Amino acid sequence: AVVIDGDLKLVAATKSPTTEDVMSGIVAAMHEVITQIGADEARNIGFAMLGTTHCTNAIVERKRLNKVAALRVGAPATTAISCMADWPDELKNAMRVRDFLVHGGNEFDGREISALSEDEIREVARVVREEGFESVAVTSVFSPVSDAHEKRAAAVLREELGEGFPITLSSEIGSLGFLERENASILNAALYDVARTTADSFEAALASEGLTDVAVYLGQNDGTLMSVDYAKRYPIFTIACGPTNSIR
């Protein structure tokens, strides 16, 4: 943890090991730098930025991952290569992932492969609810060209599962490559709880030091910053931020 002034000069710094519960390590580091600058000076802090590899660690360690339903929209196409075809078994097991295929999707020029089957999506929602899945990743063929089927699928799922149920849409995650976009979306859906816990812990640590009016950001893969709400929706955008966090 560091404190930097308006001229980008280092004012205070400390290093603390990552802890299993996230909160205690963040609190310890935060308290140390606040102690170094003093409570009066700390009241002048206007921005707080967190760079973390907690999401990366969760994938590597196969821990704390959401139970994911992977919904592929593309039948009768997309059956040649199964969902998560070359994933490590231990990662799939850690996510307790199950894949579903429903009719829908688009061609490269936006034409429908087939009409979106809302009945099939409602059946998926029933399984998700009954089997305790914690998030859904929706991937439709060529959704970066036309995202209508993904958005409608998400709307149907929320009608059945509740407005706040975590749903990832692949058109918001990746580009045209179908399998790459699907894989990234599934990982994003698996990281919702990790991202929420990390962000909430950071805000709680700030509050414990009386820093309740600061603007809070998290670092993302390209070295830029994103809001807390954005990070909670798209935790996949933090998994390669280790190197950019370390640039001095």
Model-found features: residue ranges?
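N-terminally biased helix-coil "hinge/interface" segments that flank
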Residues: 1-248
